[in-house]
UniProtKB/Swiss-Prot annotation:
Chain coiled-coil ranges: none
Gene3D superfamilies: Erythroid Transcription Factor GATA-1, subunit A
Nucleus listed as a keyword: yes
Family: Belongs to the type IV zinc-finger family. Class A subfamily.
GO molecular function: DNA-binding transcription factor activity; sequence-specific DNA binding; zinc ion binding
Domain of life: Eukaryota
Gene name for this UniProt entry: GATA14
Species: Arabidopsis thaliana
Biased composition (Basic and acidic residues): 57-66
Biased composition (Polar residues): 185-196
Any Pfam family: GATA
Places the protein is found: Nucleus
Name this protein carries in UniProt: GATA transcription factor 14
One CC-aspect GO term: nucleus
Length: 204
């Protein structure tokens, strides 16, 4: 039998030994001495049962799991975690706007720069290409013809400041016609061929 069962048996045996007044189950009222005597007997049993309960608790604590000791746990810090502060120079920083003149804005919009093409002299081109004088020396149109071997002296794009309709063209077929005419006609006293004057009259 376990300690708790022994305790219940001792408590029940002690309760049986208490003299119960005869008038407890009667309808007639009992006197005060009888009531106080019964209460004193119950009080003694309760006090004795407390001793039995203490012994049973010691017995139970040996077999029970060890209780957690919360005193050894680290206490929570009172300080709050804060996000890292950003440096002040990054907040509110505004990029400085560089103001350009209207002419500069127009030139940058249409690709006009201070650089000029070494063949046609144009400054307006979407892309600078490699030429016989190095990288970025020809405009896009002249650079494409240079890569294919068709960059001839008679070729000029329409945007070239040196473009002359009677001696230049931006079409390869027309360029070849101008070259054939120059080779077929002998130059006159001014150094120009007859084909030069004929193309000038026709408006080419």
């Amino acid at each position: 039998m376990s300690g708790r069962e022994d305790e219940e048996e001792d408590l029940g045996t002690a309760m049986q030994k208490i003299p119960i007044p005869v008038n407890v189950f009667d309808k007639e009222p009992m006197d005060l001495d009888t009531v106080f005597g019964f209460a004193d007997g119950v009080r003694e049993i309760i006090e004795d049962s407390n001793l039995l309960l203490e012994e049973s608790r010691e017995f139970d604590t040996n077999d029970s799991k060890p209780s957690r000791n919360f005193s050894n746990l680290p206490t929570a810090t009172r300080g709050r975690l804060h996000a890292p502060k950003r440096s002040g120079n990054k907040r509110g920083r505004q990029k400085r706007l560089s103001f350009k003149s209207p002419s500069d804005l127009f030139d940058s919009k249409f690709g006009i720069t201070d650089k000029s093409c070494s063949h046609c002299g144009t400054r307006k081109t979407p892309l600078w290409r490699e030429g016989p004088r190095g990288a970025g020396t020809l405009c896009n149109a002249c650079g494409m013809r240079y890569r294919t071997g068709r960059l001839l002296p008679e070729y000029r794009p329409a945007s070239s400041p040196d473009f002359k309709p009677n001696v230049h063209s931006n079409f390869h077929r027309k360029v070849m016609e101008i070259r054939r005419e120059r080779k077929s006609s002998p130059p006159n006293s001014f150094g120009f061929s007859e084909s030069y004057h004929s193309t000038r009259k026709l408006g080419f």
